[in-house]
A protein has these predicted regions:
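An anion/pyrophosphate-binding glycine-rich loop and adjacent beta-alpha core
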Residues: 250, 256-399, 473-476
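Glycine-rich Rossmann-fold phosphate-binding loop(s) that bind the pyrophosphate
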Residues: 41-44
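Core beta-strand elements of the Rossmann-like FAD/NAD(P) dinucleotide-binding domain
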Residues: 33-35, 213-222, 435
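Short beta-strand "acidic-cap" motif of Rossmann-like dinucleotide-binding folds
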Residues: 58-64, 259-260
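Glycine-rich loop(s) and the adjacent beta-strand/alpha-helix scaffold that form part
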Residues: 222-277, 281, 450-473
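Conserved N-terminal glycine-rich FAD pyrophosphate-binding loop of Rossmann-like flavoproteins
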Residues: 67-99, 265-269, 276-280
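Glycine- and aromatic-enriched mobile tails/lids
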Residues: 15, 19, 24-27, 31-36, ...
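Conserved redox-cofactor binding core of oxidoreductases
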Residues: 124-214, 226, 270-284, 289
C-alpha cells in the first residue's frame, strides 16, 4: 500500500505558507536553465504555471490539446473570481474567505491548503490587473465586486459575463511572451497518453500528435499535470467536448493515488436538456443569482399547466409563486452554495412542481430586479448572458411578457442542475506533489482546496493561485535536489516500454471492429453515471451502477467500432482512448460514493439526510480524505487509503445557511 504524507508545515494556519517559503529550498538562476519541466495543459492553471516557470528561467515544455491555449475550457467561466480585497468594506478578510470556503466544502477540505488559497487570492487580482484584465469598475474607477453563493459579502471580481475568457487572455499573453523569448516551447494539438517513471520519479511523458497520429517521447526533470476535471464521464455536462481525464487516469494507473472522486459538483443554473440528441449542456452564470430569483408555482395544478404548455411563467402572479430558496434559507436566499441549490431544485421537480414539458426545470426570474433597477442596469450586468440564453432557447429574459395588477412580469429563464465541476482529483500534498516523486498536479485536476463542494468563483482563483503563486515555490523545493541530474534521453528503456504500452492499447482498440460507436457507448456510460452516481445516490443504486459500468467496459472491449486507421488524424480514435479512461473514472467515482456512508457537499446519499432533507455528515467515521490506489482495470476494486483531516483554526460543525 502506498504511504501518503501531506507535508503540512508546523505552526498556526495563518503562518504556515509564510514559514514554508522562508525555509524552502531554492534553485539559483544558473541552475534553473539546466532544469526541464513539462507542463501538460494550457488552461488557467497550466498557462499561468508555464508562464511563471519560464519567467523564472526554467526550460518548459507546454502541451496543448487544442490549436491554441486560447481555446482552453477556462474560457467558458463566466461569473468571476474570488479575492479577499474587502473593497466593499463589508466585513471580508482572508480569514472570512478561508472560513467560507471550508464551510462551503462541508468541512471536507484540507485546512492548510484552503488558508493558503485565501492568502494568495489578493495577489492574483493585482497580477491580472497588471496584465490588463478589464475587470468591471465602479463609477469612481475602483474595481467592482458582486456576491456569489455561500458568502454574505461581495468579493467576486468580474469582467461582465466573460471573466474566464479575460483571465485566460492575460495568462496567454504572459505565456506568449515566454514562448517568444524561448524559455517555453509550446506543443499544440498534442495529448498526453502516459507518464514515464524512471527510478521511481516522473521523468517524462508519452504524447500523441493529434494531427499525424504519431506517438512521441518527451523527457524532463519534473512533470506538471494541469488538464482539468472528469465531468465528461457523465457525457452530458457543462464541460467542453474535449475535456477529459486521460492524463489524470494515466498517472493514477502509474501509482498516483486519486482523492475524493465522489465529490462531483452539480451546478444549479444550467439550461435544461432539450432532447436525446444533445451532446453538451450550457451553464448560466451563478452571478445571475445576485438579481435573479428562483421559483416554482405554489399550486401543483399551475405546474401541470406549465408542463402541458397551457400557460407561461409570466401568467402566474406573485402570490402564487414559491421562491423556495428564499423560503428555506432566509439568511442566504438565492445565494446558497451550489449543492444546496441543486438539491432543492431536484426536490421541487421530484415533487411535481417542474415547469417545462419534462418536469425538470425551475424558473430564474429577473422581473423584480428589472422593476427595481431598470432594464439598462440589468443588461449592463448580464446582457451577454441574456443574449446567450436567447440564442439557445429563443426566449429573451429581458423582454416584458405581461403586466398583472400594475406589476410588470418579464420572461423568466428555465434552469436545472447539471454536472459542472469535480472537486475530487489526483491527490497532492501541501507542495502540490502527487504520490509519484516529481509529478505535480494543479488546478481542477487535483483535489486540494474545495472539499466536498466548491464555492462559485473559486475555480479561477485556485487555478491561478496554483499556477502563479504556489507551484513556482514548491516545485523548487523538489528541483533543488535535481540540479546535478543531467537531462534525460528518451532512449531509456522506460520510455520505450511506456510508448510500447500506449501503442498496444491503440492497436487493441482499432482491432475490435464491433458495431457500437464511441458516442453510443459514451451515452450509455453517461446514463448510468447520472442515474446511479448523480445527484441522489443510494447503496443499492451504486452497486447496480458498478455492475453496469463493468458491462459497459466489456461492451467497449468487444463491440466498439472505430472508423479509419491509427495513422494520421483520427478523432474517433482519440475519443475512444478518452472514453476508456472515463469508464475507469466512473468506476472510481462509484466506489468512493459507495464507501462514503454519509452525505456531504456534492456527495448526497439518500440514506443519510436530516428530517429537513439536508446532508447528514458522519464526522466520526468519514472525517478524512479518501485516497484510492489503482489495482487494475479488471474486477479488482481500488484500495482505500485514508488521510485524516486536521482542523485547528475552524470548529467543525453542521452547515447552516438558514440563519
Amino acid at each position: 500500500m502506498i504511504k501518503i504524507d501531506s507535508k503540512i508545515p508546523e505552526g498556526p494556519v495563518a503562518e504556515k505558507w509564510t514559514n514554508y517559503k522562508a525555509h524552502q529550498k531554492l534553485v539559483n538562476p544558473a541552475n534553473k536553465r539546466r532544469l526541464d519541466i513539462i507542463v501538460v495543459g494550457t488552461g488557467l492553471a497550466g498557462a499561468s504555471a508555464a508562464a511563471s516557470l519560464g519567467e523564472m528561467g526554467f526550460r518548459v515544455f507546454n502541451f496543448c490539446i487544442q490549436d491554441s491555449p486560447r481555446r482552453a475550457h477556462s474560457i467558458a467561466a463566466q461569473g468571476g473570481i474570488n479575492a479577499a480585497k474587502n473593497y466593499q468594506n463589508d466585513g471580508d478578510s482572508v480569514y472570512r474567505l478561508f472560513y467560507d470556503t471550508v464551510k462551503g466544502g462541508d468541512y471536507r477540505a484540507r485546512e492548510a491548503n484552503v488558508y493558503r488559497l485565501a492568502e494568495v487570492s489578493n495577489a492574483i487580482i493585482d497580477q491580472c490587473v497588471a496584465q490588463g484584465v478589464p475587470f468591471a469598475r465602479e463609477y469612481g474607477g475602483t474595481l467592482d465586486n458582486r456576491s456569489f453563493g455561500g458568502a454574505q459579502v461581495s468579493r467576486t471580481f468580474y469582467a461582465k459575463g466573460q471573466t474566464g475568457q479575460q483571465l485566460l487572455l492575460g495568462a496567454y499573453s504572459a505565456l506568449s511572451r515566454q514562448v517568444n523569448v524561448g524559455t517555453v516551447k509550446l506543443y499544440t494539438r498534442y495529448e498526453m497518453q502516459d507518464v514515464v517513471i524512471v527510478d521511481g520519479r516522473a521523468r517524462g511523458i508519452i504524447a500523441k500528435n493529434l494531427v499525424t497520429g504519431e506517438l512521441e517521447r518527451f523527457a524532463a526533470h519534473a512533470v506538471v499535470i494541469a488538464t482539468g476535471g472528469y465531468g465528461n464521464a457523465y457525457f452530458l455536462s457543462t464541460n467542453a467536448m474535449g475535456c477529459n481525464c486521460t492524463a489524470a487516469i494515466s498517472c493514477y494507473r502509474k501509482g498516483a493515488v486519486f482523492a475524493n472522486p465522489a465529490y462531483v459538483q452539480i451546478h444549479p443554473t444550467c439550461i435544461p436538456v432539450h432532447g436525446d440528441q444533445q451532446s453538451k449542456l450550457t451553464l448560466m452564470s451563478e452571478s445571475l443569482r445576485n438579481d435573479g430569483r428562483i421559483w416554482v408555482p405554489k399550486k401543483k395544478e399551475d405546474a401541470v399547466k406549465l408542463q402541458k404548455g397551457e400557460i407561461k411563467g409570466s401568467d402566474i402572479p406573485e402570490e402564487d409563486r414559491d421562491y423556495y430558496l428564499e423560503r428555506r434559507y432566509p439568511a442566504f436566499g438565492n445565494l446558497v452554495p451550489r449543492d444546496v441549490a441543486s438539491r432543492a431544485a431536484k426536490e421541487r421537480c421530484d415533487a411535481g412542481f417542474g415547469v417545462n414539458n419534462t418536469g425538470l426545470a425551475v424558473f430564474l426570474d429577473f422581473s423584480e430586479a428589472i422593476n427595481r433597477l431598470g432594464i439598462d442596469v440589468v443588461l449592463q450586468r448580464y446582457g451577454n448572458l441574456f443574449d446567450m440564453y436567447e440564442e439557445i432557447t429563443d426566449v429573451n429574459p429581458g423582454e416584458l411578457a405581461k403586466e398583472i395588477s400594475g406589476v410588470k412580469y418579464y420572461n423568466p429563464m428555465m434552469i436545472y442542475p447539471a454536472i459542472h465541476y469535480t472537486m475530487g482529483g489526483i491527490w497532492v500534498d501541501y507542495e502540490l506533489q502527487t504520490t509519484i516523486k516529481g509529478l505535480f498536479a494543479i488546478g481542477e485536476c487535483n483535489f486540494s482546496d474545495h472539499g466536498a463542494n466548491r464555492l462559485g468563483a473559486s475555480a479561477l482563483m485556485q487555478g491561478l493561485a496554483d499556477g502563479y503563486f504556489v507551484l513556482p515555490y514548491t516545485i523548487q523545493n523538489y528541483l533543488a535536489d535535481q540540479i546535478t541530474v543531467p537531462r534525460f534521453s528518451t532512449d531509456l528503456p522506460e520510455f520505450a516500454e511506456a510508448e510500447k504500452a500506449v501503442q498496444a492499447k491503440i492497436d487493441k482498440f482499432m482491432s475490435i471492429q464491433g458495431k457500437e460507436s464511441v458516442d453510443s457507448i459514451h451515452k450509455k456510460l453517461g446514463h448510468v453515471m447520472w442515474e446511479y452516481v448523480g445527484m441522489g445516490r443510494t447503496a443499492e443504486g451504486l452497486k447496480k451502477g458498478i455492475a453496469e459500468l463493468k458491462e459497459i467496459r466489456k461492451e467497449f472491449e468487444t463491440n466498439l467500432f472505430i472508423p479509419g486507421s491509427k495513422e494520421g488524424m483520427n478523432v474517433e480514435l482519440d475519443k475512444a482512448i478518452r472514453l476508456y479512461d472515463f469508464i475507469t473514472m466512473g468506476e472510481l467515482v462509484a466506489y468512493d460514493a459507495l464507501n462514503r456512508n454519509e452525505s456531504c457537499g456534492g456527495h448526497f446519499r439518500e440514506e443519510y439526510q436530516t428530517e429537513e432533507g439536508e446532508a447528514k455528515r458522519d464526522d466520526e467515521n468519514f472525517f478524512y480524505v479518501a485516497c484510492w490506489e489503482y489495482q487494475g482495470d479488471d474486477e479488482k476494486a481500488p484500495i482505500l487509503i485514508k488521510e485524516p483531516l486536521v482542523y485547528e483554526a475552524i470548529k467543525v460543525q453542521t452547515r447552516n445557511y438558514k440563519s
